[in-house]
Amino acid sequence: MDMNSANIEEIVKQVLAGMSGNASAASAPAASGSIPKTAHVAMLTALEHYDIKEFPIPEVGDDDILVKVEGCGVCGTDAHEFKRDPFGLIPVALGHEGTGEIVKMGKNVKKDSAGKDVKVGDKVVTCMIFRDDPDITMFDMNKQNVGAADVYGLLPDDDVHLNGWFSDYIFIRKGSTFFNVSD
């Protein structure tokens, strides 16, 4: 399959149709704005093949954030992973250029990675998850070695599953770089 804008558009349409078609009462938010028990994830399960999976939404810990996804771009990296899996991640929830609204957060979450206050209802984006020094690039742009970092949308699948923005919800974990973009 040749990867071009028409192919990507068709893939996105198929994923969105699958997510809409698989909606269940458990994963649909109630009119009161309550958080559903499950979320849908467009999981790349084989080369050039997505399955819409439904997973329980994990409990939000003291340092975690649950975000309702509002949108996500399709990057060339997503297309490369879809076509060739160069990172050996399958199965994987792709999507690393997304944004959404905080619907629940742990009691220890007070500020984003730039020091801006955050609260439920704020719009956020993610960047890297630094395993070593989370401030590696925050204050010195000459320090661009991100070899010890992970990216949502390019994380191996685990027991959380909500690791990419191609989903209803994304689960942002302690140590993640995220920014409040509400303004």
Question: What do these predicted ranges mean?
Answer:
Residues 1-35:
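Protein-protein interaction and targeting regions used for scaffolding, dimerization, and localization
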Residues 35-42:
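Short structural boundary motif marking the start of a folded domain
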Residues 42-50:
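Extracellular beta-rich ligand/substrate-recognition surface
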Residues 45, 56-57, 89-95, 157-162, ...:
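Short Gly/Pro-enriched turn/cap motifs at secondary-structure boundaries
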Residues 52-57, 99-101, 169-171, 178:
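Conserved hydrophobic/aromatic beta-strand scaffold that supports enzyme active sites
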Residues 56-72, 85-138, 182:
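Glycine-rich beta-strand-centered segment in the early N-terminal region that forms part
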Residues 77-82:
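Cytochrome P450 core scaffold surrounding the K-helix E-X-X-R motif
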Residues 111-112, 130-183:
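NAD(P)H dinucleotide-binding glycine-rich loop of Rossmann-like/cofactor-binding domains
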